[in-house]
UniProtKB/Swiss-Prot annotation:
Pathway: Pyrimidine metabolism; UMP biosynthesis via de novo pathway; UMP from orotate: step 2/2. One of its GO terms (cellular component) is cytosol. CDD domains: OMP_decarboxylase_like. Disulfide bonds: none annotated. This is Orotidine 5'-phosphate decarboxylase.
Amino acid sequence: MNNTPPIIALDFASAQETYAFLDRFQGEELFVKVGMELFYQEGPAILENLQERGCRIFLDLKCHDIPTTVYKAMKRLAGFGVSLVNVHAAGGKQMMESALEGLEAGTPAGQKRPSLIAVTQLTSTSSEMLQRELLIETPLLDTVVHYSRLAEESGLDGVVCSVHEAEHIYRAVSVDFLTVTPGIRMADDKNNDQVRVATPGYAREKGVSAIVVGRSITQAEDPVSAYRRIGHEWEGTKA
């Protein structure tokens, strides 16, 4: 995922809204994220249409179930031709290994297996929430680093994490391990419901592999300009 452009989170309720948004980006080769709301509303057809538009896809369904179920789910997802899928690291090593096995079994001959990453802790999770609501006494950063090690041991390609945790993760895993980071905002944007946020430039400085950007692009007055502005900051180039 070297030189990956900002991944746009398509947090829309319908295909119609999604296509109206994407129609603005004529000539752009986009990497987009399809989450639960859009996929559950539109099904695999949304993926087919996005691929016809030339989009690379991160299918963000965060699978978390018993190993056998996750294996079967990933085997089906492997046939969709997406670039990136994920599971929850909290499902444990056996579940993550089963997810990888399912992807390998379901990827059509001659095609590249989708990259598989594990969600460590959601960017909406705070240390206080971890301790008071989830009754996890281990510090937030320690859980993220531990989950990252576990994901690598399970054969996964990387993790979803906060930018602030990436440098700590790279002290514990190999340099080619992917760190995909949501919670990206420009300095003058609102944080909304995410508490561990960062700018594209800060993400670049911390050496993350890819950034995921939603509202800063999708809710901008000029989404194309916002996308390019974020891209320039992410790449460290002048607009």
